């Protein structure tokens, strides 16, 4: 399936607050993510707690061991909601 991508304002604010090394890791992961958000290298997984809270399926991908990007898919649009540590899951 061909996706369009729409980062939210919150995603960009969190991205700009990352260290330069984390930004580099995110850029590398983004190249993979744009090809396939569910590529095995990104370890995409459903976040049950957030999915239940927002009434839609919410996913996260692993960028670094303690850095995740959270997103959902609406029709063919991948909306990247936020990026950060496990605290995003709360």
Label the predicted regions:
Residues 32-61:
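A short, surface-exposed loop/turn module that caps and links secondary-structure elements
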Residues 11-42:
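N-terminal first-folded block
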Residues 2-4, 10-20, 54-56, 60-90:
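Enriched for short, Lys/Arg-rich terminal
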Residues 4-5, 40:
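Residues that recognize and position ribonucleotide moieties
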């Amino acid at each position: 399936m061909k996706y369009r991508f729409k980062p939210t304002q919150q995603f960009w604010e969190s991205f700009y607050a990352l260290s330069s090394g984390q930004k580099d890791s995110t850029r590398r992961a983004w190249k993979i993510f744009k090809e396939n958000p569910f590529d095995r290298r990104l370890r995409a997984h459903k976040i049950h707690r957030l999915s239940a809270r927002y009434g839609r399926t919410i996913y996260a991908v692993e960028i670094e061991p303690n850095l995740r990007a959270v997103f959902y898919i609406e029709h063919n649009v991948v909306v990247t909601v936020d990026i950060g540590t496990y605290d995003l899951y709360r």
